[in-house]
Amino acid sequence: MSSLDILASRLPAGTISTDPQTLHHHAIDSWSLALLRRVRGDDLPGPAAVISPASTGEVATVLAWASQTGTAVIPRGAGSGVCGGAQADPQAVVLDLSRMDRIGEVDAISRTVEVQSGVRGDRLEKELAKLGLTTGHYPQSVAISTVGGWIAASSAGQASTGFGAIEDVLLGLTAVLPDGEILRLRPVPRSAAGPDLRRLLVGSEGTMAVVTEATLACRARPKAWDWLAFGFADFAVLADTLRTVQRAETGAAVLRGYDETDAQLGFGALNHTTGCVALAGFPDGPPGLDARKQAATAILRATGTELGARYGEHWWQHRNDAVRTYAQIMGPERAFGPGVIVDTMEVAGLWSNVPRLYDSIRTALAAHAQAVACHLSHLYPSGSSLYFTFLITGTDDQDAEARYRQAWHTAASSCAEAGGTITHHHGVGRLKAPFLETELGETGAHVLTRIRKALDPGGIMNPGVQRPRIKQ
């Protein structure tokens, strides 16, 4: 009896699949380079098996077996990650958590909801909407991503400026450690009982444990949104103005600023042709909405030109369209033809570094890409994220891949030199692992490696992900 047969005897029938189509589907995630390789016909090996547990106990059984046999495990939510965090290996098994999709108790008094980690975001929001609630966590991938994926990649929703990122929504969790032991962290608003173990697992991308259940904070669901939109001739002026709006505590849950290229992409349907665009979105409900909107309007009007609420309404209606466009370009359809690769780079830095980050990264990407666009979308009192989209056109797929690697290398180096972080909410995966030592420093990289080794001495958890290239 093989080790996989032994595991199968410990799990419900049908939990393990070695069907070729299933293995093929689980071979990659949504990393653009992996998608390029697939559509050009590269042989991308699938895992040895796909295991689809339905409970925390079943996950514990799988990891205990994997630890005993030395089998690598690749946790997977919905496969929407864009950094290669769920790339299969023929010697590994993929732990597909999509069957763990139960939405549990909603505590109306505390405004919390218990969920399994395989619950998709759009389904969760539909269920909460029936109760007049929302998590307030709206990533662009909400329809194709899971709660577990949000935690693993340290997700930030489109309303994070007002509602916070996933670490602000996550109150408690259950996770299975690499040896099969179950870790339960009760839901509380905050704790000083030592280092925050919940926060340790946020952004860990399945390298330290598998999160199986979570308790999330909820809030009253906005019934409507009010929008402001202003045009700016200069991106630096736009960024400075949005910083002022953010610090004025106007209650804008959405603050976004587009450079001219991104504004043309996002608002071309409104006949927008020149200049940058700033958006501010205000959820109804909190008192004093009119006064707060007036305060934001005064700040924006001092340096910008009013464009009208239709810009915000258009963005809200089409805010997730890029997911479909990405699939059309990088999928079998190859809407832009062969030799084309599109990707995003979401960095972040202090306000004092934002102009330098914008200029240096845009210049670095433009040296290899045919188009580069950028927007600010997650704003803080101390700084902001900068979300770059870039399109590379090569003479063929191999040339496009070479240009892609060069673009990432030069842009990541530029980000570090300008004082930014190479990822704000997409995670590290395999794509950004080579840049981790520069990001964390040699000592920081050693700390991360030691923590990981303490939890996973056998090195079975998602090998290749978040592996700093340091001297041992």
Model-inferred region functions:
Residues 1-64, 81-111, 260-269, 314-342, ...:
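N-terminal flexible segment immediately upstream of the FAD-binding catalytic core
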Residues 17-36, 220, 226, 231-410, ...:
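C-terminal substrate-recognition/cap domain of FAD-linked oxidoreductases
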Residues 12-13, 416-428, 452-453, 457-461:
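Alpha-helix capping/hinge segments and adjacent helical runs
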Residues 102-256, 460, 472:
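FAD-binding subdomain of flavoenzyme oxidoreductases
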Residues 181, 432-472:
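Activity-critical C-terminal alpha-helical subdomain
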